[in-house]
Amino acid sequence: MHHFPFLDESIKLKTHNRLYPPKLYKGVVWQDNHKLLYLGMQDQFHTFNMFDCQAWFARDVIMGKIKMPSADEINKDINKWVAMEEKLENPDQMIDFQTEYTKELHDMSDYPKIDFELIRKHFKEWEHHKVEDILTYRNKSFSSPVTGSVAPIHHTPWETAMDDSMKTFLNK
């Protein structure tokens, strides 16, 4: 549940944790007041790249590079995404949904190129690893969607890595 005690009731986002909150055009712009922007309100598979794409989209809305459509078009767009989200049945579909959402935001701005298909593939692998073993899924290594380089596997299994200091991380 999101909590915004500093906002007037008329502009508070009221929703449970979901992939596409209603009342937010492109998941960012408050439907009834286009000067109010919310970032990161979605349940997340994509985190930083989604936040970045949202921020670049918000920047372009503020700067007037992205023109807001009519109220009817905004409503149709929100309803389309909410309806698609409500039909999702499993994590793979949820990953596909959020990948498509993030790609759409990406394509609306000049955000640098990123390999969303590789990200989609990695998230699905990660989700299956999590189902296979909740204690070891974090011990996997993936390639960067920007550089393609593969991260080394961490020297200590996640379950037993109790010292998360930089010194321990870098010295083992």
Language-model region placement:
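Beta-sheet entry/capping signal
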Residues: 1, 35-36
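Flavin (primarily FAD) binding-site architecture
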Residues: 1-15
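Generic structural "secondary-structure junction" signal
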Residues: 6-9, 26-30
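Short, surface-exposed linear patches
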Residues: 15-20, 58-62
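Alpha-helical scaffolding within the catalytic cores
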Residues: 19-26, 33, 120
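C-terminal, flexible cofactor-proximal segment of oxidoreductases
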Residues: 37-172
